[in-house]
Amino acid sequence: MKKIWIQIKNISMSPTASWDDIKTQVLTERELLSNYLVFIAAIPAISGLLGLIFMGENFFRAVFWAVLFFGFALLGVYLTAKVMNFLATSFNAEQNTQTYFKLTAFSATPIFLSGIFFLIPPIYGLSLLGLYGFYLFWIGFHRIVICPREEQFNFFFISLIAYFLIIILIFLLPALISGTAVYQGIL
């Protein structure tokens, strides 16, 4: 657990050095998922569960939302990596799902950490601090993705759009499917 907090601190406070370190790490998708991602993705799921219960939501509906959110969060990181890997050839970039999975997982850190604000629904707006994750995505992209310089911005921009849309779906779908959208201010 201490290693996770060190990684969170490093990626948040020293992103350039952290990305250089991440680039050299040999992490399988399974290792990254089980040793890092499940823990940070649990933060908004658990915070949202407690926040929904606090606001008077039905316990089982809140649990259903939390399970959906957690699953969609993990799936979203995985899908973003797969989309980037698929798009890579269009931009003459290296196809390497492992690199794209590291990029999306570690850049999602502030997005998932900002989920702590789900604990108190009236301050959901502070979860916008998670937008720092898109900055980390920018820094990480230029540090770990192998792509010709002339194609780099285009590949980054298309990848960012895909990442952004998938993040929006991660946040919307669980609320809509579980019926908690009213409590979360979506409907």
Residue ranges and their predicted role:
Residues L75-F91, L128-V145:
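Membrane-cytosol interface at the C-terminal ends of transmembrane alpha helices
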Residues P44-A73, F118-G130, I168-L187:
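Membrane-helix interface segments in multi-pass membrane proteins
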Residues D20, V26-V38, Q95-F118, Y135-I167:
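Interfacial aromatic "cap" segments that immediately flank transmembrane helices
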Residues E57-I116:
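Alpha-helical transmembrane segments with an aromatic anchor "belt"
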Residues E31-N35, G51-N58, K82-A93, F164-I168:
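Short charge-dense sequence patches
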Residues M1-I46:
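N-terminal juxtamembrane cytosolic/stromal segments of multi-pass membrane proteins
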Residues M1-I8, R30-N35, G56-V67, G71, ...:
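Structural motif marking the loop-to-transmembrane transition
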Residues D21-T24, G51-G56, T89-A93, R143, ...:
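Perimembrane helix-loop junctions in membrane proteins
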